[in-house]
Amino acid sequence: MTLIKRMIAAVTLTLAAAGFTVNETALPRPVERAAIMAALVVMTPEMEGTVYEAYPDTGGVWTICTGHTKGVRPGDVATPEQCEAYLHADLGQAVDYVMRAAPDAPLFSKIALADFAYNVGIGALARSTLLQLAKAGMHELAAQQFGRWMFVAGRDCREPKNNCRGIPIRRELQRSVYLVRL
């Protein structure tokens, strides 16, 4: 099963457990948040990977677990339980921001925006043309914006020598998820 199909299944099951379907609009905020989180718990670890010892990421930022950066120092070690807690807290911040910033965006667009915010930072999303287009309901144009975010620390991640090939793969996945309509 593809990653997107697993995400759709996670969203569908979460909504069904709350008595809703994926075709419903105006979901209650807690239900929508739970559905977005369910998809991200599938998507984000697949893109980030999980490492229990601190390491400098491609951009030189000290990172641990599944992309957690806040307060990480060389030599830090985390348990699987700590990593899970970091992931849920960090994803929750991204989801809460996206739900406030783009409340009218379709569900899967919010999932893609939240993963993007998790990856590049809420501030970067807040200043982006991507978010402005999403808020304006210009979803085809917004989806094209993911392709503009291919650089890490000034290096073009489309170039194999720059050791960040996962970024173009992730941006294409985000673009595809952004456009999912069920």
Which positions does each model-derived feature cover?
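Long, amphipathic alpha-helical surface segments
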Residues: 1-53, 72, 77-88, 92-96, ...
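Short, surface-exposed glycine/acidic/tryptophan-bearing loops
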Residues: 52-78, 108-110, 114, 130
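Active-site nucleophile-His-acid catalytic modules used for acyl/amide transfer and hydrolysis
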Residues: 93-128
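Structural recognition of the beta-strand scaffold that forms the well-ordered cores
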Residues: 43, 63-65, 112-115, 141-145
